[in-house]
Amino acid sequence: MRLVRLLGMVLTILAAGLLLGPPAGAQPPFRLSNYVTDNAGVLTSSGRTAVTAAVDRLYADRRIRLWVVYVENFSGQSALNWAQRTTRTSELGNYDALLAVATTGREYAFLVPSAMPGVSEGQVDNVRRYQIEPALHDGDYSGAAVAAANGLNRSPSSSSRVVLLVTVGIIVIVVAVLLVVMRHRNRRRRADELAAARRVDPTNVMALAAVPLQALDDLSRSMVVDVDNAVRTSTNELALAIEEFGERRTAPFTQAVNNAKAALSQAFTVRQQLDDNTPETPAQRRELLTRVIVSAAHADRELASQTEAFEKLRDLVINAPARLDLLTQQYVELTTRIGPTQQRLAELHTEFDAAAMTSIAGNVTTATERLAFADRNISAARDLADQAVSGRQAGLVDAVRAAESALGQARALLDAVDSAATDIRHAVASLPAVVADIQTGIKRANQHLQQAQQPQTGRTGDLIAARDAAARALDRARGAADPLTAFDQLTKVDADLDRLLATLAEEQATADRLNRSLEQALFTAESRVRAVSEYIDTRRGSIGPEARTRLAEAKRQLEAAHDRKSSNPTEAIAYANAASTLAAHAQSLANADVQSAQRAYTRRGGNNAGAILGGIIIGDLLSGGTRGGLGGWIPTSFGGSSNAPGSSPDGGFLGGGGRF
């Protein structure tokens, strides 16, 4: 019986060995002793020779060792696992690649160390998928090994170089096109900016500050050239004008040209400073460019200020005959008015008191004298115009202008007599209304002075002077014999008083609006500060220092606003607005603190959250620090992720494996 049991145990062990043992031909990972190992017997003599030659050539060319091993199967392991274990067992390094092939199991693995120099992942995958695997699939075992060796021994292909060259060429073309487009856009942008800069007042420094720096530089260069050309032209024309009209008549033009030259010289000096080898900061360059433009603009305006007068002077000489004919016609027309105007003056003396006629009593006599003076100058001007002697044109100009002035005065004297009756009647009829208006103005002035807190300062002093002048004018107008003169004086003082009262009324309205704005600003600031203060007071247990700091500053600003309420309302409004802004910020910070605290206590789940937030219970609040007590600190995890840089599922190898 014992013998039977012993025999059964032996049979069981043998059966287990048959069932659990490796299949026939199985080859576990082992240490490789040769570059080409054919344990599956699939290589022919010529095939082994070809593989050996390819392996040797790879080592000779690139010092890379390729190990090739053929087995029937991988003893139940995956191809990658078997190959990796064989690599470790064989102590292969960074210059050792392995091609393992299971002929019966139709599996393979091609592993190349990722640290192997001169080999890319794409290159290895391309060799494995498109050269090794197809050869194995077709049963060409030696061809697969040769393909592996040649693939590792391959330098960058010509197609890759072509692709690289084409890519570089395309990039160069694109960059060139971009440069051309950008240059065109820059030129167009600079032209637009320069056109906009030309529309800016060149003497306005504030307006020039908004002009781009490049446009400012372009504008300065353009203006310097333009103004220099204008100065040169004006200098030449001035020399001819002095010869023609003399130095006295052309003195204003000479002064304008000299001023323009001085301003232009200053512009050139600054422009030289900009163009030297000493670099300037953008701010310094802007300041210098602005000085160039302003100086050039002043030079240009000096010339422009006299251009019109200079042209009129030349036109007067050129058109002297026609102009003298016109003056002669005016002389004749005014001379014919002397008799009728004298008759009209006599009639006025019978209608009005002599005192009312004082301002026009001698008008006819004076007009006759002016006409005689004009006649003499017209005759002298004709003689000079007929002679046309160079250098005597100044006398012609003086004679023409003297005649024009005399005729104008004679016309005004005669017109005054003709309109005297109408003017005197209008003055007499309008005097009561003007007097009433002045009396009303004086009354308003007295009321304003009574209400003013400081009657001897500011515009109130001007108002006192205007009121007193109006009162004196009223006193003189009472019983005046010359109503026209009285009316003229009263209208002037009335206009002055009304203008000053209107200005004071506008200033008072402005002050009233400012005070209303101040009251509104103070009300808003006080309301916000009070609301935030009450909010923090009822939730003091959860609000940190930031909100409290903003509130304290808001209170300080509000106090400053009250201090300046009377002396400087504008500053008081600014302080009140600042207090409102700070209070609003404090409210926002306080809300955030309360919400954070509520979330923390919600996570902890206590029943005293409201009391703690309100500062009634402070034990829990202080138990963990200012912020940590509201839930504690949450530590972060340490260590990298499973896919940290530098790690890979194949243990630092390129390539892979699979079935064929």
Curated annotation (Swiss-Prot):
Stimuli inducing this protein: Induced by albendazole and thiabendazole, which inhibit the GTPase activity of FtsZ and probably septum formation.
Protein's cellular compartments: Cell membrane
Changes seen on gene knockout: Not essential for growth.
Positions of transmembrane segments: 162-182, 605-625
Region spans: Disordered: 638-660
Pfam families given in the database record: TPM_phosphatase (PF04536)
Keywords from the named record: Cell membrane, Coiled coil, Membrane, Signal, Transmembrane, Transmembrane helix
Keyword tRNA-binding appears in the UniProt entry: no
A cellular component term, taken from the record's GO annotations: peptidoglycan-based cell wall
Membrane topology label: Multi-pass membrane protein
Superkingdom per UniProt: Bacteria
Ranges in a coiled coil: 488-567
Signal peptide range in chain numbering: 1-26
Role summary: May play a role in septum formation.
Name this polypeptide is given: UPF0603 protein Rv2345
